[in-house]
Curated annotation (Swiss-Prot):
It holds the Pfam family PrmA. Disulfide bonds: none annotated. CDD domains: AdoMet_MTases. This is Ribosomal protein L11 methyltransferase. It comes from Escherichia fergusonii (strain ATCC 35469 / DSM 13698 / CCUG 18766 / IAM 14443 / JCM 21226 / LMG 7866 / NBRC 102419 / NCTC 12128 / CDC 0568-73). Belongs to the methyltransferase superfamily. PrmA family. Its EC number is 2.1.1.-. One of its GO terms (biological process) is methylation. The gene is prmA. S-adenosyl-L-methionine binds at residues 145, 166, 188, 230. Methylates ribosomal protein L11. One of its GO terms (cellular component) is cytosol. It is an enzyme of class 2 (transferase). Its main location: cytoplasm.
Length: 293
């Protein structure tokens, strides 16, 4: 069925309030878009992280009286009479199919593919992880996830134990298991991420080798041959004393979720415990790796 969209431009601080206003005016869904394509951090679990200049887009049924919607919105204290907006009639198309068509199998490194369930596997002999977009972060589309997957693909994980610190969808832990790791441990502060990781592990036939914990439940003195943490630069710096003790002596560390401009400060937080490799960058993001002293 056809739809009508109404777009407002605002600050990140006001975006949530205007989202609520659009829903109260009859919008069936809301989308936030960056007005200037400015790179931002990935959201923490449960958080909506917005840009300084944000477009808030409400989607309305084609039968909606948009003059009435505008009249309702004019009463909002952040808008007022004659507020700037854009109304557009969208063509009739299968939007669910349109969304699904945007996701394709993706290759990382030499062996690893991430494939949505509705697509054919490009190479039956490759290491294939079946993963659909969902509630928790991590489908391989973000540069930080890509950097971590490429790093894991480059390692010999046969028989190793891997910790995925901030596991999100479980994509890194599951990829490690499919690449030969004997055991993976996923840790996340978000119960939804734990459930998403569990579901994705079952789909990929590795649930018997994946342990999942909220931080308060994780075992004491937990160790691994490889530790990967794709979170944010701030938490990586703050949690450096905790993360640094997770790899065994000679074990490997991979960190991402870091803008290239933040790499130096993150490296400083880990330099005493690890022999660090050169920083690898991709699309203004970077990956830091090293070996435990």
């Amino acid at each position: 069925m056809p739809w009508i969209q109404l777009k407002l431009n605002t600050t990140g601080a006001n975006a949530e309030d205007l989202s609520d206003a659009l829903m109260e005016a009859g919008a069936v869904s809301i989308t936030f878009q960056d007005t200037h394509d400015t790179p931002v951090f990935e959201p923490l679990p449960g958080e909506t992280r917005l840009w300084g200049d944000t477009d808030v887009i409400g989607l309305f049924d084609a039968e909606t009286d948009m003059k009435e919607v505008v009249a309702i919105l004019e009463n909002h204290p952040l808008l007022g009479a004659g507020f700037a907006h854009k109304i557009e009639q969208l063509e009739d198309k299968d939007w669910e199919r349109e969304w699904m068509d945007n996701f394709h199998p993706m290759r990382f490194g030499e062996r690893l593919w991430i494939c949505p369930s509705w697509r054919d596997v490009p190479d039956e002999n490759a290491v294939n992880v079946m993963l659909d977009p969902g509630l928790a972060f991590g489908t391989g589309t973000h540069p930080t996830t890509s950097l971590c997957l490429q790093w894991l693909d480059s390692l010999d994980l046969t028989g190793k134990t891997v910790i995925d610190f901030g596991c999100g969808s479980g994509i890194l832990a599951i990829a490690a298991l499919k690449l030969g790791a004997a055991k993976a441990i996923g840790i996340d502060i978000d119960p939804q991420a734990i459930q998403a990781s569990r579901d994705n592990a079952e789909r990929n036939g590795v649930s018997d080798r994946l342990e999942l914990y909220l931080p308060k439940d994780q075992p004491e003195e937990m160790k691994a041959d490889v530790v990967v943490a794709n979170i944010l630069a701030g938490p990586l710096r703050e949690l450096a004393p905790l993360i640094s003790v997770l790899p065994v002596s000679g074990g490997l560390l991979g960190l991402s979720g870091i803008l290239a401009s933040q790499a130096e400060s993150v490296c400083e937080a880990y330099a005493d415990s690890f022999a660090l490799d050169p920083v690898v960058e991709k699309e203004e993001w970077c990956r830091i790796t090293g070996r435990k002293n």
